[in-house]
């Protein structure tokens, strides 16, 4: 009986978790995805578009700065930034974005995505001006919740 109850509760919790995932709707929101690995980019774009995001991509930090700097104020709702990339890494790019004169450069949520999830790595990303740190492989629910928290809290 206890086993059946635990199983039923587990299924109920799983269904509740699935329902929570389906609640996210980012229609009309725009994100800049900065990732040098093509497979990671394709997977992330698929995950983001499935929840309504429109997505621009950049393969390195320098390209991300160029795209962000050319965008109109408020065009991007968030930036997802890999840390280790060629040409310019994510920490340097985030720091440079924070120093741009673009109107939302100081406030746009920049979220690190990296395999490096030690306390020291998290501190480095925050020191560079990033708002949050997601460990790879990215868990979709955690990604959506983090984006929701930053984007919709910012809209209030």
Where is each model-derived feature located?
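C-terminal compact regulatory domains
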Residues: 1-156
């Amino acid at each position: 009986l206890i086993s059946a109850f635990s199983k039923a509760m587990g299924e109920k919790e799983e269904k509740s978790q699935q329902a929570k995932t389906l609640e996210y709707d980012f229609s009309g929101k725009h994100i800049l995805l900065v990732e040098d690995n093509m497979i990671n980019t394709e997977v992330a774009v698929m995950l983001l578009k499935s929840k309504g995001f429109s997505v621009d991509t950049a393969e390195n930090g320098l390209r991300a700065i160029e795209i962000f700097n050319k965008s109109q104020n408020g065009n991007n709702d968030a930036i997802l930034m890999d840390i280790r990339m060629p040409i310019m890494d994510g920490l340097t790019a985030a720091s440079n974005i924070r120093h741009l004169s673009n109107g939302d450069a100081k406030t746009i949520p920049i979220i690190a995505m990296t395999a490096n999830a030690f306390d020291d790595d998290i501190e480095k990303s925050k020191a560079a001006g990033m708002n949050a740190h997601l460990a790879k492989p990215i868990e979709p629910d955690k990604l959506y919740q983090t984006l929701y928290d930053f984007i919709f809290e910012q809209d209030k």
